[in-house]
């Protein structure tokens, strides 16, 4: 029987993580369970930095970005001896289960703890929207609004100077954030990690737009596809149009979460407690067709793939 639960946030922060912690804490307390907050992710778990939380511990956090528990990348967690210390710390504290909020790297940590016999539930907290088994991740919609606002501002100045602007968006190997922001922001060109990219082809498309009378343009590109500064130089050289690159960077991770992220995080947090009380462990929570779902965390990491929104891209091409 589950009586005492730990909760931590891990990896890159995302708006809505605080709302998720709140959902876990309030739902656990409503069921008569004890809940412990673990500071700075798996590193804090290894260092035994945790404390008991009550309902007032999560007052006034639902509207705050970031995570009040803190987060840290802890590559040493790959070492089985380090994980064993973590398990021993939780056992000594009397914890029966752990809720982990983070991305796929955080899920991998939860998977390894589950394999060591300690039940974990994973909640998808990342702006990248790249976690399998869920339509959306906590923080994605807030980041989308942040990127869209930046694109709108770039369009103002790009149109004033008849300039080509390249905006680099986070997402790693997933183009969801870039694609959605590009459609919403009316970007003329989209470069995604899921689609083969050629600078020469992009320049040809830009030249075609110029020949049709296009005075300015915005290129939305997912990080890691290429060096955007070098791409800007190449486009300017080939087109004769002033071209500037803007890397949005970590500003995309900050800010007060939008309503949907707060609701999603709250629902997922509460659902994780339901699953633990039903005897589940080694699961990850998702939302599909607006319903809460759960999957085997090993299956989600190793076998499940996020479908590429090819139909969205085809729509975008028709609009630009």
UniProtKB/Swiss-Prot annotation:
It is an enzyme of class 2 (transferase). Its cofactor is Mg(2+). Substrate binds at residues 126-128, 163, 170-172, 223, 244, 250-253. Mg(2+) binds at residue 104. Its EC number is 2.7.1.11. The active site is at 128 (proton acceptor). It is found in: Cytoplasm. SUPFAM superfamilies: Phosphofructokinase. One of its GO terms (cellular component) is 6-phosphofructokinase complex. This is ATP-dependent 6-phosphofructokinase. The gene is pfkA.
